[in-house]
Amino acid sequence: MKKLLLSVCAFSLTLATLQAGEITKYVNPFIGTGAIDGGLSGNNYPGATSPFGMIQLSPDTSEAPNWGDASGYDYNRNTIFGFSHTRLSGTGASDLIDITLMPTSSGRTSSAFTHDEEKARPGYYQVMLKDEGINAELTTTQRNGIHRYQYPAGKDAEIILDMDHSADKGSWGRRIINSQIRILND
């Protein structure tokens, strides 16, 4: 009897996992990411995050987001200024949007992109950075952001780390007062 009960439980868990995977294919992470007719956007972002995770890894389409694109991403824009690790979704107030990485091979701090070469699904984001031909892929675990950059052959691989990147420094007077980096292995 115990074996039968355990078998039924294991089978049920397997079905639940399969159903969850099938359902996520209907999710469109771009819903609520763009302003309509000059109004405010839904303040959502298409990037990677895990349920109850500490990291919300997504592109920044503004150097200093404000009310109109408080999540750091606006679908109507076509420039990426980096990939931030924390952000709020749907709040209408820009906050977090810090610890930004930007892949480059020439020191550029931004790159054009098109939505034709941008993909998102729950837990995953990918975009081709047009200016230098760098493919960026992002995913997360509960406590980590994972980046994978593919650079064109023969180009230098550089990453700009901006620990002073924060939402709308101008109008709200925010500034980072202390930041540090510790390299454990190189």
PLM features: what roles do these ranges have?
Residues 1-4:
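Positively charged n-region of N-terminal signal peptides that target proteins for export
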